[in-house]
């Protein structure tokens, strides 16, 4: 089980990562990582970066059957 400090240190080393990448790297369940990232965000230590839907080259994101699942969410330290 990873700690909040380990999540912060991993983000410091990698620059930016997705929550799923952090979960796999630290061998910690995704809901736990999501909670830790939200806590870091509330503390002002981490920032959530969401991709702009205008960046879709095909323009089909608006009609995507997966509900914009192709849009990625990154985390980085402040």
UniProtKB/Swiss-Prot annotation:
SUPFAM superfamilies assigned: Winged helix' DNA-binding domain
Which InterPro entries does this chain map to? FeoC, Tscrpt_reg_HTH_FeoC, WH-like_DNA-bd_sf, WH_DNA-bd_sf
Q: Which Gene3D superfamilies does the entry link to?
A: Winged helix-like DNA-binding domain superfamily/Winged helix DNA-binding domain
Q: Which domain of life does the protein's organism represent? A: Bacteria
The GO terms this record gives for MF are: DNA binding; iron ion binding; iron-sulfur cluster binding
Pfam families named in the record? FeoC
NADP is among the record's keywords: no
The positions annotated for binding iron-sulfur cluster are 56, 61, 64, 70
Q: Which UniProt keywords apply?
A: DNA-binding, Iron, Iron-sulfur, Metal-binding, Repressor, Transcription, Transcription regulation
The task this protein performs is described as: May function as a transcriptional regulator that controls feoABC expression.
Q: What family does this chain come from, according to its entry?
A: Belongs to the FeoC family.
Instruction: State what protein this is by name.
Output: Probable [Fe-S]-dependent transcriptional repressor
């Amino acid at each position: 089980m990873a700690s909040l400090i380990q999540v912060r240190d991993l983000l410091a080393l990698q620059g930016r990562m997705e929550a799923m990448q952090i979960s796999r790297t630290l061998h910690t369940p995704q809901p736990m990582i999501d909670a830790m990232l939200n806590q870091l965000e509330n503390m002002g230590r981490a920032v959530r970066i969401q991709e702009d839907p205008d960046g879709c080259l095909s323009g089909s994101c608006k009609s995507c059957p997966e509900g914009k699942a192709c849009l990625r969410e990154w985390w980085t330290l402040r």
